[in-house]
């Protein structure tokens, strides 16, 4: 089924979020840089000569050991721990719902308090996808999204606000909490080995917070996920693509999904501001791109929309000269969508053509379909529940 094309003036680009972040009365230290932590220590009277050491201790306990309160930080003096507990927390987002798929995929709905007003608390999703050789965590960057991509469920949800660096890092910490994945894990392995910024929101429209969060996640003295195992996905915010390479230095993925501007204008309305030619030039200019650090182009397979062999041929032509791989994504249906997933035979033909042209073209294995694991679905479904049902979900998540 071919959806109706929106009028040209329906373009949705970067908008001011409806709300700004209101910190709790006792803010969390999660997401602060080392310099910011030193400033907070100064606020509670820690002498300048001690701050560097105390920052390193805090960093170790928060990001390497996963401490959930200051009492666990036994290498820090009791007096400083008491002052820290009086003024700050190391709280993560609250798990209000958890779903576990038959294939092992886990999806969490996380509550982000706004000040002391529980009624204004917002929720985001993150998803853990276990595979034989890795465990990938899909992380959100905004509450809702402004881009209105027609095939994406999050596009049906309004943009409420940007996440803070702490709320982004907090998703990784929640996953490690739930998976028992901190330094004291008996077998010494890690379940969360890869991070993808492919959850709710457009990361490059929340650049500073995403940058600060990913620098913390990639820090070798803490969470320690290599930057080569962190992928930032964008729908094509061209001015911030090269900047991301310079200031963050992680792997880049582009939500392409179409090879002609007319169709991409419909699927990804941001294309009307930054068309394909400009987007691909930014990819060619991305710092550090090489055969070993290829840019991933994501391409959702929509039946009768973008899955012809002519589309595959033009895709190969467009990507000439770019160190690239193409990730073909079978469409994950959601209630109310007008799209269907391409037939499997057609996906294989599309993939084979790209592969024969010299590009890696893996087909992403659909995961978590039994738990509505496509981005934004759990949030939408829980919003339909009554208050009593939501309280029951929260209790189950907390006691699981």
UniProtKB/Swiss-Prot annotation:
S-adenosyl-L-methionine binds at residues 201-202, 233, 255-257, 332. Keywords: 4Fe-4S, Cytoplasm, Disulfide bond, Iron, Iron-sulfur, Metal-binding, Methyltransferase, rRNA processing, S-adenosyl-L-methionine, Transferase, tRNA processing. It catalyses: adenosine(2503) in 23S rRNA + 2 reduced [2Fe-2S]-[ferredoxin] + 2 S-adenosyl-L-methionine = 2-methyladenosine(2503) in 23S rRNA + 5'-deoxyadenosine + L-methionine + 2 oxidized [2Fe-2S]-[ferredoxin] + S-adenosyl-L-homocysteine; adenosine(37) in tRNA + 2 reduced [2Fe-2S]-[ferredoxin] + 2 S-adenosyl-L-methionine = 2-methyladenosine(37) in tRNA + 5'-deoxyadenosine + L-methionine + 2 oxidized [2Fe-2S]-[ferredoxin] + S-adenosyl-L-homocysteine. Its cofactor is [4Fe-4S] cluster. This is Dual-specificity RNA methyltransferase RlmN. HAMAP family: RNA_methyltr_RlmN (MF_01849). It comes from Bradyrhizobium diazoefficiens (strain JCM 10833 / BCRC 13528 / IAM 13628 / NBRC 14792 / USDA 110). The active site is at 125 (proton acceptor), 375 (s-methylcysteine intermediate).
